[in-house]
Amino acid sequence: YVGERIYHDSKYYILDTPQKKILVFDENGNFLYDINKHGNGPGEYTELYSFYFNPFTGDLDLLSPMGGILRYDSLGQNFKEKIPLPLTVPAVHQFIALDKDTYLLFSDSREGNKMVVYNIVQRKIISELYDLPKFLLFNTFYHHTYSPFYICEGKVHFVQSYNGDVFTFENNSLIPKYHWDFGEQNFEISDLKDEPMEYYFKYARTVGAKYANIFVSYGENSRYYITDFAYDNKYWTLIYDKQSKEPVVFNAFKEGHECIPSFVDESGVYLIGADPNYGLNILNAEDLD
């Protein structure tokens, strides 16, 4: 399936998770090349969960959950270095750079706090936070599918995928930014039990469907915040106008397509579907007015 998706330097980068490689396309959707470092040698990975263009170094960082961060040049061709992970973190599944020496790491499998702030020069965990039960991340749908981190207006943001709350990350703390009040449809995890995945397949279609949850895709620019979520066994889109401070919620465009944002910039919202008949669509910012 399609994993992480990034628009960078006039190119689309899409993680092909099963093949463990990154596909690169031009702005017209034409395939250019792939970045494939799968293997067991130096600078190679056995698993690839995420990737990131590091704004502090200009390099492409590839995240191997147990193998570390592999740093390549911006084209993904020349290997530069391997950044090992902290010994107390069994695996890292998502990441973002806070500065040239520091990363914010998210580990689904770590006991206790799932986020750690890690200084790669000192090889030291600076702080840790965000304690969630492991079963929530492995047995349920109430967790992120893509990176929970994004940058907007120079700040690192974190999306809490089970209820859509958005935070900025400042001074090693999560600062609330957006909270969506669905009233009686607000979703809480406090009553969830450690049950197998089969239990939560049924739960999501029955009890869970009564609430707004599973915020999978999201993005923000200077004018709008946009996200999609599940409710009543359908996917819905929420667009928040930061000027009017008014949200709009809808199920699909009038043409029939759902709006599941892959990423957002100042020009609009990019929608990439795994279905070959869906392809790439761009919703211009003016069309939201």
Residue ranges of predicted features:
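Short loop/turn segments that connect beta-strands within beta-propeller blades
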Residues: 26-28, 73-77, 119-123, 170-173, ...
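Blade-loop segments of beta-propeller domains
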Residues: 21, 30-57, 64
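Conserved blade-ending motifs and adjacent loop-strand segments that build the rim/top face
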Residues: 177-208, 243-267
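Residue-level detector of Asp-centered blade-edge/turn motifs that repeat once per structural unit
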Residues: 7-9, 53-57, 97-100, 151-153, ...
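Loop-centered beta-sheet repeat module
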Residues: 116, 120-174
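Repeated scaffold domains used in trafficking and secretory/extracellular systems
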Residues: 2-4, 46-51, 89-98, 138-147, ...
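Asp-box/WD-like beta-propeller blade repeats and closely related beta-sheet repeat scaffolds
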Residues: 47-48, 64-114, 127-138
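Beta-strand-rich domains and repeat architectures in extracellular enzymes and scaffolds
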Residues: 1-18
